């Protein structure tokens, strides 16, 4: 259940953030180079280091986020200690970490689109929003499909940020499938149970991937 609670907001948020990153990186305006450096930092940072940093930032006592909120008179929650906020906090940290990598993949699909389509659309009076929805998104669909496949598999394999930031707490609010497999296998030494959970996870991922592969025929456009 917690794994699903993580996946449902993570996938659309990550995809939206990655599209924004790709759109910004595709521009040639001043300041884009600096943005490229900033977006590279989360990608190059290991999950262990990133999780430790965010665990400190989200600390209720001395965390930077709650200190900033206090300046505006807002009493911030115990992000990783509150059952309501723990999983949303993990989701947002994961989006921050992954959007650079997936944004780069989407960027490769975006810059491969023939500029002639946009020129023809401009002659027909299409605006930026119309060009994005009618040209960019349809022709980027193979890249978007790849991102959806990989991000869904990664989401099912959620582990390091949970172990470091929450350890499955509070009260099991962030205990996900892989973290449960790890604990039963290497803390409680119930290898049989952990192996069974691993096979269940494998089957779930395989079924979801199969459904995505079948469904992509209806919306993915491989013709440029």
Map each language-model feature to its residues.
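A structural signal for multi-pass alpha-helical bundles of membrane permease subunits
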Residues: 1-224
